[in-house]
Design a protein with these regions (language model features):
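Expand to "…catalyze enediolate/carbanion chemistry for C-C bond making/breaking, isomerization
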Residues: 35-298
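Short linear Ser/Thr-Pro motifs
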Residues: 11, 30-31, 214
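Hydrophobic alpha-helical elements and their junctions with loops/disorder across both membrane
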Residues: 28-31, 244
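Bacterial N-terminal signal peptides
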Residues: 17-29
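Bacterial N-terminal signal peptides that target proteins for export
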Residues: 2-20
């Protein structure tokens, strides 16, 4: 604990590898998610689970409907992948969503871009994970890191936001240790410098964007050249001591992956509807539909 305080006093945040190592030690000694006076104070449970060697899965949300968001937040996902790059969601809408249901799933935002405005708005409304799309230059991810972190580590300004109401009065002192940075590798240019991207201390996760890699290269999964590209990204990430991410369809089918993007809410609604129409529950057992509106026979 004292070691972390000394390091933090010098740099503003200890190297993520040291943070996670100390988190793992603390969690081994205290089997609760929120240990008394942890060093550093961790409330991002995704960091805690990864430090324990567990895999994490996030559901994808692209709609501003609060009922849908809160259902996803309490469905059992480790985090929610709030999709702002490929949706019409506004920061005001996402702020309302996160405030309505800040957990149990931790809010991660895929920002439209890695600009100062996008990054600072995302963290100010309470995101504990920043997913940066199309990382194909060091400048892009370094810029995102800079504006996601308070000084002395970064240049995040201290302004208005709802983060304090969500994560506690000591947020300013603990934010740098709780906000995760996910770099998405979506094209050959990003794959070419993935070793440099993964080596950046404040990059926590490198995401292998399976569909976009296929789109940009013209290759399909299973093609030897595609698989070589995916393996290159994975190996460089693991060599740097970081976590490898991919689609949830790869969970259990590819080694070395710890962080997964799950299906969007629309796909899950469709899956649930099909199960209901077949008279089955998600455990595959037959179920009848109760005559009372709004309930199910279980």
């Amino acid at each position: 604990m004292q070691t972390m305080n000394l390091v933090g006093a010098v740099s503003g945040r200890a190297p993520r590898s040291l943070t996670l190592a100390l988190a793992a030690v603390a969690l081994a000694a205290v089997p609760t998610a929120h240990a008394a006076e942890p060093a550093p104070a961790l409330y991002n449970t995704v960091i805690e689970k990864l430090a324990r060697g567990e895999q994490v899965v996030g559901g994808t949300v692209s709609t501003a409907d609060l009922n849908v968001y809160c259902a996803m937040a309490s469905a059992g996902f480790d985090f929610l992948w709030i999709e702002m790059q490929h949706s019409s969601l506004t920061y005001q809408e996402v702020a309302t969503m996160i405030r309505a249901c800040p957990g149990p799933a931790i809010p991660f935002i895929r920002v439209p871009d890695g600009t100062e405005g996008d990054i600072q708005k995302a963290v100010d409304i309470g995101a504990l994970g920043i997913i940066v799309p199309m990382v194909d230059t060091l400048e892009k991810i370094q810029n995102a890191i800079t504006f996601a972190n308070y000084p002395p580590l970064g240049k995040r300004s201290q302004g208005g936001g709802q983060y304090g109401a969500l994560w506690g009065r000591n947020y300013r002192q603990t934010a740098n240790d709780n906000i995760m940075m996910v770099a998405m590798i979506e094209n050959p240019a990003g794959a070419e410098i993935v070793d440099q991207i993964a080596a950046l201390d404040d990059v926590d996760v490198v995401f292998v964007a399976s569909s976009d890699l296929s789109s940009f290269t013209g290759l399909r999964q299973g093609d030897p050249s595609y698989e070589a590209l995916v393996t290159k990204i994975k190996d460089a990430t693991l060599k740097a001591g970081k976590y490898v991410a991919g689609p949830s369809a790869w969970k259990g089918t590819r080694d070395g992956y710890s962080f997964f993007q799950g299906p969007p809410e629309t796909a899950l609604i469709q899956s649930g509807a099909r199960l209901s129409l077949r008279g089955e529950a998600d455990d595959g057992q037959p179920r009848g539909v109760a005559p009372m509106e709004g309930s199910e026979g279980r």
